[in-house]
């Protein structure tokens, strides 16, 4: 593919991102406008290359600014939106302390931001691209081959590794990253990690990799199937993920109506509806129009 075609594709991708389009959307728009010089897979490869180049430039800018005592130009705020399960996954790695100072096991996890379900989690001795790729292969298999439209992560070395990003883009997945040093750009997975570490059963220190892996596996099962999450109207993540919350919602409506009929004086004429999970979830996104 010629450099001029690559440049035009990169221009379409950049313009599409400004207009709220992902890579596939920009490809379709260009196609509608009569530009068809490369396959969608090639567009994904070019998009990944552009991101890597931008990351290199941004890192150099940060380093130069730090040396000169100047403030680096802020990265554009990421915006992702999900209106259903398996549209957007977020992932991260957190430390699980051991008895040795400065030594921690690494817990990897992927969460669906719409349903809050932990798709898959694992624990390893260290952070590595190979383990991250294995995590995503396991997640895709766990969802019956379904892949998300977007994967969001922070700016860790593994999260920005070329091999991982090429693996994701090869599966047609758009990659999104938090801004450097912005703590609330990856809120869903951070919230899940806080839940993991704030439970009464959390040991605080892990004696072995097996112990850490066992704790995380037990936590994920509880979190997905028994944790009535306040962010999804007190349904479990598994119920929202597979849609079974709707059956329970109908039951809740019947129970509430019965309660209201027995005690009308407690409602003063106001009949509150049964809360349902929001129709969308996002990161720095105002919501669907």
Indicate residue ranges for each PLM-predicted region.
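RNase H-like DDE/DDD metal-dependent nuclease/strand-transfer catalytic core used by mobile genetic elements
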Residues: 36-37, 76-222
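Basic, flexible linker segments flanking DNA-binding modules
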Residues: 1-88, 182, 238-253
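Short, polar/charged, Gly/Pro-enriched helix-capping and turn/loop motifs at alpha-helix termini
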Residues: 19, 23, 57, 146, ...
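Conserved active-site tyrosine of GNAT-family acetyltransferases
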Residues: 43, 47, 136, 223
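General alpha-helical segment detector with a strong preference for membrane-spanning helices
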Residues: 53, 69-70, 96, 116, ...
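Generic structural signal for individual residues within well-ordered alpha-helical segments
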Residues: 7, 27, 44, 117, ...
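A general structural signal for alpha-helical elements within enzymatic catalytic domains
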Residues: 14, 31, 48, 140-141, ...
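C-terminal domain-tail junction helix/linker
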Residues: 169-171, 195-289
């Amino acid at each position: 593919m010629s450099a001029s075609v690559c440049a035009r594709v990169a221009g379409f991708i950049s313009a599409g991102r400004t207009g709220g389009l992902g890579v596939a959307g920009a490809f379709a728009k260009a196609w509608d406008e009569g530009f068809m010089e490369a396959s969608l897979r090639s567009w994904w490869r070019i998009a990944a290359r552009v991101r890597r180049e931008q990351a290199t430039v941004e890192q150099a800018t940060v380093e130069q600014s730090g040396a000169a005592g100047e403030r680096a130009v802020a990265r554009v705020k990421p915006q992702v939106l999900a209106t259903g399960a398996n549209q957007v996954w977020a992932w991260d790695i957190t430390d699980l302390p051991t008895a040795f100072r400065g030594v921690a096991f690494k817990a990897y996890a992927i969460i669906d931001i719409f349903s809050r379900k932990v798709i898959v989690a694992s624990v390893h001795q260290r952070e590595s691209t190979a383990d991250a790729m294995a995590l995503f292969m396991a997640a895709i298999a766990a969802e019956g081959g379904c892949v998300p439209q977007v994967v969001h992560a922070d700016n860790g070395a593994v999260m920005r590794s070329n091999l991982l990003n090429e693996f994701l883009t090869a599966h047609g997945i758009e990659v999104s990253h938090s801004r450097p040093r912005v703590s609330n750009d990856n809120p869903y997975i951070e919230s899940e990690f806080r839940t993991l570490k704030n439970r009464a059963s959390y040991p605080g220190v892990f004696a072995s990799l097996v112990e850490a892996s066992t704790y995380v596996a037990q936590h994920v099962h509880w979190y997905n199937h028994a944790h009535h999450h306040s962010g999804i109207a007190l349904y479990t993540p598994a119920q929202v993920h597979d849609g079974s919350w709707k059956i329970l919602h109908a039951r809740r409506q019947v129970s509430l109506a019965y309660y209201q009929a027995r005690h009308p004086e407690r409602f003063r004429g106001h009949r509150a509806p049964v809360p349902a999970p929001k129709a969308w979830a996002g990161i720095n996104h105002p919501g669907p129009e």
